[in-house]
């Protein structure tokens, strides 16, 4: 490991510290790795979103590439921000092994790009478990080539955030219930 970057937000930073435990490298804070700014969605329980923000919640569920919470960041912006951020990190560290700690939606946006897909295919990209590892190699032209995605084999089953949740699975039977 040659370099560690992290979103300055607490959970990603704690992950970066765990990654860096034995390397002892400086962790470089990178605001471009931050999670989507959820605007009015921030702090609202998922179960309340359909009732409070029906149109925006429907976009999140059905056409996530068009999503933008009131006062928040658009999915398109996150997609472009993550591309620019990771590209800058890779170009600043040619030939080096880099760890970058980020957040679910931001990671999902970057993986969509790294897979060579347009943002409109983001719903086809898996949600990654907390602390899951995705390995992406970059060629001499700094183009990403995913090797593997969402490897959480280091986690015992009880520590997996997704083992006990179903909201991330596709299909109406797994959707969060609307609050009446």
What are these regions (language model features)?
Residues 1-57:
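Phosphate-coordination/substrate-recognition cap region in phosphate-metabolizing enzymes
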Residues 56-77, 170-176:
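Short glycine/proline- and acidic residue-enriched helix-loop micro-motifs
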Residues 9, 50, 75, 79-83, ...:
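Amphipathic, non-transmembrane alpha-helical scaffold segments
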Residues 89, 96-104:
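Generic beta-sheet signal
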Residues 36-48, 91, 96, 112-180:
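Acidic, low-complexity terminal tails and accessory targeting/binding regions
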Residues 11, 106-107:
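Alpha-helix capping/helix-boundary segments
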Residues 6-7, 80, 101-102:
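Short beta-strand scaffold positions
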Residues 18, 109-113:
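Active-site signature of alpha/beta-hydrolase-fold catalytic machinery across serine-
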